[in-house]
Amino acid sequence: NAADFLIPVGRIKAHTDFRGEVESGICKMLVIGMGKQHGAYQCHKLGFKSMAANVKEFAGAIIEKKPNMFAIGLIENAYHQTCRIEAIPAGRILEEEPPLLDYAKSRMAKIPFDQADILFVDETGKDISGAGMDPNVTGRSPVLGISRPFFQRIAVFDLTDKSHGNFGGLGSADVTTQRLYRKIDFEQTYPNGITAAEPLAVRLPV
């Protein structure tokens, strides 16, 4: 309440665990990012089935309480390059974020075939995706019912340094390396899995 202005800045993109009018973006940042672990837990405990509606409803309440703000939405292309920047007044966030999400989905990375025996992933990491490996790209998710692309096995070779040992999402892989395992910090990772109610995401592959 002491702040004169609130200016959330964040990427608008497809979420790794739920579908809706708003997914990863300004609304989610207001509810879960700024809410930190307590805010994230309050939203996640209601389940992913209603997550999109809850994020939008909670964000609306925050905007109503804090009207002296505007948001900056960033959209990246398939090469993690910023391709669009939008400044959005507080009163238009709920209206303008959904079409920006549609645009972001049209620009996201895609694997150019639907099926293969094995997918080799050079690096996984929280700086790449909140799920380490983006299920929207790999087709592997402990939550979403994704059928394509389909890979019989997924092998992950390394963890990005910027993840600081957080291996969240590695549970979607079948095989990994000792090199990656040596970088793991369980104390950094497990609170994410517990807060998000996704224990499968933080299990270890072979």
Question: Positions of the model-derived regions?
Answer:
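Conserved, well-structured core segments that form the ligand-binding/active-site neighborhood
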Residues: 2-125, 139, 147-149
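Hard-cation-handling environments
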Residues: 129
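C-terminal non-catalytic interaction/assembly regions of soluble proteins
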Residues: 135-206
